[in-house]
Amino acid sequence: MPKPIFISFEGPEGAGKTSVLEALISELKTKLGDDLVTTREPGGNPISEAIRSILQPEEDNGMDKRTEALLYTAARRQHLVENIKPALDQNKIVISDRYVDSSLAYQGGGRGLGIDNIWEINQFAIDGLLPDMTIYLDVPVEIGLARVNENRQGKIDRLDKESISFHQKVRETYLKLQSEFSDRIKIVDATQPLNKVIDDTRILINQILEDKS
């Protein structure tokens, strides 16, 4: 019987996470069929998608940073209960575009709320469920934001309006987490050409699929 596998993807703005995921999920769907479940945060179900619309408005809604952290955590809890856990209980392979490390990096680091504080509220939400592997696509802030500006199609969200300092804190926190939890969090150099980033990420995914088979 196949074993359940939970993989999350992380990265700062402009790391190319969406492009890498689209390419690899297409490949994996062909290989794994219904055994593969893909989802995203915040989102994945009606409640979490409703929270997403509050968290990612077209205009700044003046949201308090602690409110933001709690809403992301609430969306994560519903996502876990409604999407991730049921799939893992059926021995599926779950790939999530973002998970708890996003909150640690963006709210804990970027917003300055502290990793420990964000981890505490998320422990209550995730009930100990961490990914078997987290793939972190790393890119320097200047390169990432330049990519965002180049590829923007008229839409600007709240994160696009944040300062360089905010994004630097996000990346620094991601790198700190990767250093502390290197057994779980694997880093991929996202400054490379897209095809090379996809290749490096594919190797990591194939490795865990083989290890868990």
Swiss-Prot record:
Protein name (database record): Thymidylate kinase
Catalytic activity, reaction form: dTMP + ATP = dTDP + ADP
Gene giving rise to this polypeptide: tmk
Record bears the keyword Coiled coil: no
Task of the protein: Phosphorylation of dTMP to form dTDP in both de novo and salvage pathways of dTTP synthesis.
Entry's family note: Belongs to the thymidylate kinase family.
Origin organism lineage: Bacteria, Bacillati, Bacillota, Bacilli, Lactobacillales
HAMAP family listed in its UniProt record: Thymidylate_kinase
GO cellular component, as recorded: cytosol
Organism: Leuconostoc mesenteroides subsp. mesenteroides (strain ATCC 8293 / DSM 20343 / BCRC 11652 / CCM 1803 / JCM 6124 / NCDO 523 / NBRC 100496 / NCIMB 8023 / NCTC 12954 / NRRL B-1118 / 37Y)
